[in-house]
Design a protein with these regions (language model features):
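Residue register of alpha-helical TPR repeats
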Residues: 13, 52, 92, 132, ...
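N-terminal leader/linker segments that initiate helical-solenoid repeat arrays
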Residues: 1-32, 44, 48
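Helix-turn-helix repeat elements of alpha-solenoid scaffolds
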Residues: 23-36, 65-76, 106-116, 147-159, ...
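Residue signature of alpha-solenoid helical repeat architecture, marking inter-repeat boundaries
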Residues: 6-10, 48, 88, 128, ...
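Amphipathic alpha-helical segments of tetratricopeptide repeats
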Residues: 35-42, 76-85, 116-126, 155-166, ...
Length: 204
């Protein structure tokens, strides 16, 4: 029985890891695939893995413009992930909650969620997600005109991205976005030479 249970859990993990790889490679999800995954790995089967799959369901809902559906799955994801061996994924969930709040122009709530995400990236030493969260925080600072804070966040997240050494399509897209936004912040601070050095140097 123990062997069978272990094999079953391994299959559940493989289901979630396959979705994660698909997201990393920039391959769009279909709702049918996600629905099948949610059905095959229920909360009763494994709470943590189910919570991780809920994150992918939330991402799909966000890409289709369904913010309400996205928040529903994000809430489920947080509830299921916390306190399990999959808890390290919760940083990505809080980050996405922050993104939705950001899109709704609720920047105080966005910052609150980004701060929660950073707490978990630090707890689990997840440099890649940490850099993405910092990039999102810098966007919020940029919107309210706090350009110096935005520059600080961008500089830190670029350093962390380089240390993480993740060359996936998803990460490269995020990195280019970081560089472009970093350059805009520097220009607002009239640091034109620094902007050309940072963005132009990375482009070459």
């Amino acid at each position: 029985m123990d062997i069978d249970m272990s094999a079953t859990r391994q299959q559940m993990l493989e289901t979630a890891e396959h979705l994660n790889q698909q997201m990393t490679d920039g391959i769009p999800f279909t709702w049918e695939t996600l629905e099948q995954a949610l059905t095959s790995v229920t909360e009763q089967d494994d709470k943590g893995i189910h919570g991780w799959i809920c994150y992918f369901a939330a991402f799909y809902q966000l890409t289709t413009g369904n913010q309400e559906g996205c928040l529903h799955y994000l809430d489920e994801s947080v509830r299921c992930l916390l306190g399990t061996d999959q808890e390290h994924h919760v940083a990505r969930v809080y980050n996405m909650i922050g993104i939705v709040a950001h899109m709704q122009n609720n920047l105080s709530l966005a910052m609150e969620q980004y701060d929660k995400a950073l707490d978990y990236t630090e707890k689990y030493d997840d440099k890649m997600v940490h850099s993405i969260v910092l990039s999102n925080m810098s966007d919020a600072y940029y919107l309210i005109g706090a350009y110096e804070r935005a520059v600080q966040c961008h500089a830190e997240c670029i350093r962390e991205f380089e240390q993480a050494d993740d060359n996936s399509t998803y990460s490269r897209i995020n990195f280019r976005k970081m560089l472009a936004e970093y350059g805009c912040c520097l220009l607002h601070l009239h640091m034109d030479d620094e902007a050309e050095k940072e963005v132009g140097g990375q482009r070459s």
